[in-house]
Amino acid sequence: MAKRLTKQQLTKAIANTLEAPATQSRRPRNRRRRRSAARQPQSTQAGVSMAPIAQGTMVRLREPSLRTAGGVTVLTHSELSTELSVTNAIVITSELVMPYTMGTWLRGVAANWSKYSLLSVRYTYLPSCPSTTSGSIHMGFQYDMADTLPVSVNQLSNLRGYVSGQVWSGSSGLCYINGTRCLDTANAITTTLDVGQLGKKWYPFKTSTDFTTAVGVNVNIATPLVPARLIIAMLDGSSSTAVSTGRLYVSYTIQLIEPTALALNN
């Protein structure tokens, strides 16, 4: 005849049967958590570039977009702006932010309208040099054409939109040029014109010669002709001979009004 358990013994027996599966079920979950944690990528500090062993970019410019509504033509495109090089001395140059100088294709198109308005302008540097190339690039905007050009990185770094980087870095900015989706641009060397800081909405189409001539008369007369200029400093190279480092591209959206014959646009 089976021994009859007391109420206390029965409760203990039931508890023992429940603990074992619970303990066993926790172990696989713990192992899964450890495996999941091992698969997580290690965090990196944003904005820090490490020299790659080998790196390259295929530049494919997006097709220009042109649309007209209500007498206003809107043009969106990306172009090569200028080639850049570096020496062991600081070299500071500037690019006038206006249709005549932003890109050769835009120059030919915008010359058929009397006035323009900048909706967005972005300059992006893409390297074309080995990762062993020494040098740095610095960029920023000036919004008053009467101001003198900076002569040092310290002065340039105070400009609106200032950005800098090593000449071999910046390839992650390619998405700004070809119009693809940008996933990680922490190391992109790119700067955007603050169109909200411009002196006026509409500017007359002028050439760089027109601007230079006006400056020769009075710099204050020349100021209303150009929205802004991009200041570029190249320095920290290892040789007194200029070494090619990369190219500067410009992406823009611009409004054009008052169409005119090219021969009449002065």
UniProtKB/Swiss-Prot annotation:
Disordered: annotated segments:
13-51
Q: Where in the cell is it found?
A: Virion
> Taxonomically, which superkingdom?
Viruses
Spell out the Basic residues composition-biased ranges. Answer: 26-37
Which UniProt keyword terms apply here? Capsid protein, Disulfide bond, RNA-binding, T=3 icosahedral capsid protein, Virion
Region (R domain, interaction with RNA), start-end ranges: 2-71
The intrachain disulfides are C175-C182
For the keyword RNA-binding, the answer is: yes
The record's function comment reads: Capsid protein self-assembles to form an icosahedral capsid with a T=3 symmetry, about 30 nm in diameter, and consisting of 180 capsid proteins. Each icosahedral unit contains three protein subunits (Potential).
Similarity comment text for this entry: Belongs to the icosahedral plant coat protein family.
Q: What is this protein called?
A: Capsid protein
Source organism per entry reads: Southern bean mosaic virus (isolate Bean/United States/Arkansas)
Q: What is the lineage of its organism?
A: Viruses, Riboviria, Orthornavirae, Pisuviricota, Pisoniviricetes
